[in-house]
């Protein structure tokens, strides 16, 4: 998720400039303190969380030396931890609290209203109430998925597969993953307008084994 990394880098740079009154200086000198809150998949999810964490590390460029003082990540084991983790972060000495993914939407809305002086960012959401202390970022995920659909359908045509059937495996149904699926479907149908496309949702963001099983069953 290179866009997530780029967004986090951009926001940190802008925030740092404002925090210092646009004074000249390096990221290390600015002393902006940021915390990344993730779901149970953590910062090694190879997706939004990992990209956001890479963006933070790239911004500070200190090979992890500032972890715990300038930046940190906190992992929620369940969704019940979202609000408490956000409150704890807001009451700690962090300039910026970052969350990734639509599952944080309700919790961020609730806590941002309680801490109007704390700055929050949520990535992959743009439909929450607009407030001065909450920045929302969204992607056009369907564009990349459209190209994946075109590639899959084109390969099927090159392989001479008659009446090919296509599959889509998702994590948890919701606004974001639906955009991925719709883009994929439209890409497939640009090549095969009447193609049959089946989908399956694992209902978990951290269960690749089940996703693999579902994908394999589509082949079978």
Report the location of each language-model feature.
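Short, low-complexity disordered leader/linker segments with a strong preference
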Residues: 1-32
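A residue-level marker of the well-folded mature domains of exported/periplasmic proteins
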Residues: 20-220
